[in-house]
Structure formats: C-alpha cells, structure tokens
C-alpha cells in the first residue's frame, strides 16, 4: 500500500506514519523475535529526508542487507519505472535505543541517498543518476545492462548477512 495518507490505529498514531510506513511498522511488530522480514518498497523508505520510519525499524530490527533495484525492475510485469529496494530485517528480542548508519542519508556524486547504499555499492544494481521525474528532478537507479538482472540480484543477495533461527511451535492436535 502506498499513498500520502495515514491509517487510524491508536497504537501507531503517535508516529504519524504514512500508510506504507505504518504497514512496515505493524508487520515488524507482528513478527516473533529472531524472525526475518523482507520488504519490497520504493526507494523512499530508505532515501526520504524524514528518518522516523527508519529509526523505528532500526530500534526493533537489525538490517541484514538491502538491495537497490534498477528503475526498470518492474517495468515488464507492472508497467512501472520506479527505483525499488528489497530490505531484509531480523527482529530484535527487545527495542533498543540505537541509530545505525542506515537510518541516515549522505550525498554521493551529488545525489542524496541512504548511507547504507553509499557504503555498499555492490548492493546497488545500476547507477544512481538524477533524472526528470513527475515532480521535477529526482534520483533513480538506472540499469546496468552488462549482466542480466537475475545475475546481479544473485550476486547482491550473496552479501545479505544473517542466519535463520529455528522457531518452536506448539503442535496442533490432529483430532480437531
């Protein structure tokens, strides 16, 4: 869900999240400690000026890795040209007062972007450039055509760190 509107939910109203940020926060809060969540989102989550949703997520989860997709990644099946990110988060066992580098923005080659992608260019599947968008000039990840996107994605995903922890579940009685 995307849009410039908010969801009314007493538990989250104080955060003033837009709808997509609200769903990220609520989803993460529903995951068990140690659970892993993968979000596909626009670059706005990682690159927008307001860091509040990134702070919220960082206090509750470790960023295992993030991949910036080129703006053509969804063109064939969805008809859109939008720079997107895949975020991999592992829920912490408690909320921590922490603000890692990926909460912040930096400028690289004249383009404002998330510190994580500046520090990890191997996770950017293309080249960040300023392009003319619907609301003026904006940053976009233009595709690297030297390799198929699938090969680039496979390589980037090999850099995502973390481990899967076995969860204990209560067995369901077959006689229900």
Segments predicted by a language model, with ranges:
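Flexible, glycine-/basic-rich loop-and-beta segments that form/coincide
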Residues: 76-173
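Flexible loop residues that form catalytic
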Residues: 1, 71, 92
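Conserved Class I SAM-dependent methyltransferase catalytic core
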Residues: 14-75, 82-89
């Amino acid at each position: 869900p995307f849009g410039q509107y908010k969801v009314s939910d007493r538990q989250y109203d104080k955060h003033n999240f837009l709808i997509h940020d609200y769903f990220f926060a609520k989803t993460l809060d529903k995951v068990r400690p140690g659970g892993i969540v993968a979000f596909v989102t626009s670059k706005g989550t990682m690159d927008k000026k307001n860091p509040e949703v990134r702070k919220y997520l960082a206090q509750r989860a470790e960023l295992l890795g993030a991949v910036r997709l080129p703006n053509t990644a969804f063109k064939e099946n969805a008809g859109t040209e939008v720079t997107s990110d895949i975020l991999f988060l592992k829920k912490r066992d408690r909320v921590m007062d922490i603000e890692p580098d990926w909460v912040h923005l930096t400028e690289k080659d004249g383009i404002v972007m998330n510190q994580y992608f500046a520090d990890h260019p191997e996770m950017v599947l293309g080249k960040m450039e300023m392009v003319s968008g619907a609301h003026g000039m904006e940053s976009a990840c233009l595709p690297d055509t030297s390799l198929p996107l699938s090969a680039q994605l496979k390589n980037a995903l090999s850099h995502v760190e973390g481990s899967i922890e076995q969860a204990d579940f209560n067995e369901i009685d077959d006689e229900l």
